[in-house]
């Protein structure tokens, strides 16, 4: 009889400790989240290029002969898989 009582007490102690561990593991629901302050970033204005700089860049990107490159064909041969 004493063994049965000891087992019941041990089981009750184990269940209560498991319940206590589960209760402390969950976050408190009543706590309010901390307010975050939002920092705004001010971007510097970009200076526009002068007309001379634009002309130099345009000269740099022109093709020498004025010919366009031949268009590449993108058709691929596709084989149908065997059924």
UniProtKB/Swiss-Prot annotation:
This is Acid shock protein. Its main location: periplasm. It comes from Salmonella heidelberg (strain SL476). One of its GO terms (cellular component) is periplasmic space. Residues 1-21 form the signal peptide. Residues 22-56 form a propeptide. Residues 22-40, 71-83 have a biased composition (Low complexity). InterPro entries: Acid_shock (IPR023497). It comes from the Bacteria. Residues 22-83 are annotated as: Disordered. The keyword Signal applies.
């Amino acid at each position: 009889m004493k063994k049965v009582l000891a087992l019941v007490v041990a089981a009750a102690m184990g269940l209560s400790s498991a319940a206590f561990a589960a209760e402390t593991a969950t976050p408190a629901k009543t706590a309010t989240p901390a307010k975050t302050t939002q920092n705004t970033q001010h971007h510097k204005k970009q200076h526009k290029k002068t007309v001379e700089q634009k002309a130099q860049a345009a000269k740099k990107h022109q093709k020498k002969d004025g010919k366009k490159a031949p268009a590449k064909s993108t058709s691929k041969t596709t084989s149908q898989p065997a059924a």
